[in-house]
Curated annotation (Swiss-Prot):
Disulfide bond residue pairs: 59-69, 72-81, 84-100, 103-118, 105-128, 131-140, 143-158
Glycosylation sites recorded in the entry for this protein: 130
Source taxonomy: Eukaryota, Metazoa, Cnidaria, Hydrozoa, Hydroidolina
Domain Laminin EGF-like: 66-102, 103-160, 161-171
Pfam (any one): EGF_LMN_ATRN
Protein name: Laminin subunit beta-1
Function recorded in the entry: Binding to cells via a high affinity receptor, laminin is thought to mediate the attachment, migration and organization of cells into tissues during embryonic development by interacting with other extracellular matrix components.
Organism in which the protein naturally occurs: Hydra vulgaris
Length: 171
């Protein structure tokens, strides 16, 4: 390296160092850099800020400047893919592939869906929270009063009774 090349190299190096010290935000100790600021490191989740991208993340593409996810995966939704989509239930914050399961309202072998939302209330018990008109039960598996049919069979539904007030709810 001759004197001129060496001078140019040192000048460039000094410029990079000055730029880094003047413009860059440096985080120290137990902090993590996120969107131009430093925040306490909390492991895989920055609580209230972002679900960090990991190998098992539910976010496929994150907006670099805002940190908002533009491509939620595995039936998730939300700015950080922290919720299950309508029609699915589970804990999306776990970030695994099958964390959000399809609601069974009543679902199963009938394939029928009569609620677009459900939630996990007790261990292993899913409750459908918005049964369509004419359907009732924890899985929308029964016809409501004034309706008849069998929602548990494939293609089954509940139809409004047109019985002029002559209803035998036992049949």
């Amino acid at each position: 390296m001759n004197g001129r090349t060496q001078n140019l190299w040192f000048s460039t190096f000094r410029l990079v160092i000055v730029y880094a010290l003047f413009f860059a935000k440096l985080c120290f100790g137990q902090e993590e850099c996120l969107r131009g600021g430093c925040y306490p490191a909390t492991g895989d989740l920055l609580v209230g800020r972002e679900n960090r991208i990991t190998a098992t993340s539910t976010c496929g593409l994150k907006e670099r400047t805002t940190g908002v996810c533009n491509n939620c995966l595995h039936n998730t939704k939300g700015t950080n893919c922290q919720l299950c989509k309508d029609g699915y239930y589970g804990n999306a914050l776990l970030g695994t592939e099958n964390v959000c399961q399809r609601c069974q309202c009543p679902g199963g072998s009938s394939g029928n869906q009569f609620s677009n939302t459900c939630e996990l209330r007790d261990v292993g018990k899913v409750f459908c929270t918005n049964c369509s008109e004419g359907f009732t039960g924890t899985q929308c598996e029964k016809c409501d009063n004034g309706y008849y049919g069998n929602p548990l069979i494939q293609g089954g539904t509940c139809k409004k009774c047109l019985c002029n007030g002559n209803i035998n709810s036992a049949s």
